[in-house]
Amino acid sequence: MLNSVIKRSALCRFKFTCLQVSECRPAQIEISKRLYSAKASGNGEYDLCVIGGGPGGYVAAIRGAQLGLKTICVEKRGTLGGTCLNVGCIPSKALLNNSHIYHTVKHDTKRRGIDVSGVSVNLSQMMKAKDDSVKSLTSGIEYLFKKNKVEYAKGTGSFIDPQTLSVKGIDGAADQTIKAKNFIIATGSEVKPFPGVTIDEKKIVSSTGALSLSEVPKKMTVLGGGIIGLEMGSVWSRLGAEVTVVEFLPAVGGPMDADISKALSRIISKQGIKFKTSTKLLSAKVNGDSVEVEIENMKNNKRETYQTDVLLVAIGRVPYTEGLGLDKLGISMDKSNRVIMDSEYRTNIPHIRVIGDATLGPMLAHKAEDEGIAAVEYIAKGQGHVNYNCIPAVMYTHPEVAWVGITEQKAKESGIKYRIGTFPFSANSRAKTNMDADGLVKVIVDAETDRLLGVHMIGPMAGELIGEATLALEYGASAEDVARVCHAHPTLSEATKEAMMAAWCGKSIHF
Ligand SMILES: Cc1cc2nc3c(=O)[nH]c(=O)nc-3n(C[C@H](O)[C@H](O)[C@H](O)COP(=O)(O)OP(=O)(O)OC[C@H]3O[C@@H](n4cnc5c(N)ncnc54)[C@H](O)[C@@H]3O)c2cc1C
Ligand SMILES: NC(=O)c1ccc[n+]([C@@H]2O[C@H](COP(=O)([O-])OP(=O)(O)OC[C@H]3O[C@@H](n4cnc5c(N)ncnc54)[C@H](O)[C@@H]3O)[C@@H](O)[C@H]2O)c1
């Protein structure tokens, strides 16, 4: 315990030297020098031009203006917020939430002592509620731009030369030419196509079409058992569709820990979604009112052809930089078309930086936002912070899946000596009283130091619970550190505490 306390206070001091303003004077002198050199010199010239108004771009623009940079943000969609707010995180979560409420009220009230009848879906109202949430959040960003004095150019940006961007106006906005001392490319990503399959957004849809279907399909096939496939598959399954997920790999859930993926398949299968893993799509074509799908099981080479009402293609996303003129400037990209950057988000043309889905790393909105803040802090102050070992991920199925840090497989591959602690939600009192106790928390710690390496969970509100684990990992905490923190009772967060106890001393209290 004493060791742990000493270790903890040493860590705190280390963090505070970086974070407490009063102790950062030398850095601040450097900051003002940098800010001066980042400032624009003439009229019509900007300190910062951000291309793309998604979570990466709009956050970078707001923070840039807050740090005193004359900032303009160029967006071609017509609304701010990018993929996330318009056709990603926000509309999907609105549908996930309301479809979950519908499903619970329809199928999970009797055992709770509530009698309901006549429950039905009003899909157009559910879509309207989703659209209203999107609208209020996207227009909120316009308000934040005004409040922070960020200029907003509605149009498509394309580099003329490394200092100049031409903007082709949309929605009646005039064309313009922007000169800036610094640029940030935040142009995001687009759907990865499946060769030979044409997305029409009606019968063969991407996530965008799957967010706006006008009726509940009887049968839906989802190609790809990753985050989009399982989130959107859950929405339509809860609303009544027969959903089959076709996944190339032997397991669903993409990069998540194998134990959690197993639990996820078990729980989601019970909800009625069918999985065809180790299976590849051979062809898909629209045939009248349905889609004819041909698949092959790669374990036994068995082929199957069947009709489905809707096919959702969700096999990943690829960076989007079309029409930006990056080739002309000679900006380096990797094999997957991600714009290459250094640790300060600079491309090989240093005053042009890149963040978010357009560059390396996980394609997540919070990662894009944090990079946006760090990139402008590098411009204005010469220092920024994103800890890539500590970016949480959440899958908003029910129950939710959330993780941060490394998986057990990764620990094995890296040759790290580790210990595991687990705790099931079925032994957590709040989960029991909520009658929603499927899932577990799994903690991976360094066997020698007890320091956290990864935390993985599937369970109720896992997306909220992962915040504590993320903070602990960021500050280099040990499992003992978290286990000794007082957690309120009865809360779901006690499951995290108990998994930490199991990892630290081999035993939890309630399991
Ligand atoms: C269905 C779905 C659900 C998702 N759910 C989540 C979630 O729950 N949590 C999460 O963390 N992530 C989620 N994501 C991922 C998340 O949306 C992205 O990681 C995030 O939007 C990336 O932000 P970004 O700013 O890099 O790019 P984007 O949000 O894609 O924004 C880029 C913007 O740049 C604009 N643009 C492109 N080229 C130009 C140009 N030449 N000129 C002007 N403008 C241009 C585009 O119009 C776009 O608005 C989801 C994605 C999808 C598809
Ligand atoms: N909650 C969230 O944070 C959230 C929600 C949605 C999307 N996103 C982000 O959007 C991005 C795209 O999501 P996604 O679900 O499309 O991608 P993904 O990478 O999460 O999953 C794609 C899945 O498709 C499978 N696959 C690939 N090719 C295939 C093929 N030919 N046949 C069958 N299966 C195939 C992969 O093995 C993988 O399981 C992700 O990077 C994700 O981070 C995040």
From Swiss-Prot:
It holds the Pfam family Pyr_redox_2. GO terms for molecular function: dihydrolipoyl dehydrogenase (NADH) activity; flavin adenine dinucleotide binding. GO terms for biological process: 2-oxoglutarate metabolic process; aerobic respiration; glycine decarboxylation via glycine cleavage system; pyruvate decarboxylation to acetyl-CoA; pyruvate metabolic process. GO terms for cellular component: glycine cleavage complex; mitochondrial matrix; mitochondrion; oxoglutarate dehydrogenase complex; pyruvate dehydrogenase complex. Binds 1 FAD per subunit. Keywords: Disulfide bond, FAD, Flavoprotein, Mitochondrion, NAD, Oxidoreductase, Redox-active center, Transit peptide. It comes from the Eukaryota. FAD binds at residues 75-84, 93, 157, 187-189, 357, 363-366. InterPro entries: Class-I_Pyr_Nuc-Dis_Oxidored (IPR050151), FAD/NAD-bd_sf (IPR036188), FAD/NAD-binding_dom (IPR023753), FAD/NAD-linked_Rdtase_dimer_sf (IPR016156), Lipoamide_DH (IPR006258), Pyr_nuc-diS_OxRdtase (IPR001100), Pyr_nucl-diS_OxRdtase_dimer (IPR004099), Pyr_OxRdtase_I_AS (IPR012999). It catalyses: N(6)-[(R)-dihydrolipoyl]-L-lysyl-[protein] + NAD(+) = N(6)-[(R)-lipoyl]-L-lysyl-[protein] + NADH + H(+). NAD(+) binds at G224, G225, G226, I227, I228, G229, L230, E231, E247, L281, G316. The active site is at H489. Homodimer. Lipoamide dehydrogenase is a component of the alpha-ketoacid dehydrogenase complexes. Malfunction of this protein blocks the progression of cell cycle from G1 to S phase. The active site is a redox-active disulfide bond. This is Dihydrolipoyl dehydrogenase, mitochondrial. It comes from Schizosaccharomyces pombe (strain 972 / ATCC 24843). The lineage of its organism: Eukaryota, Fungi, Dikarya, Ascomycota, Taphrinomycotina.
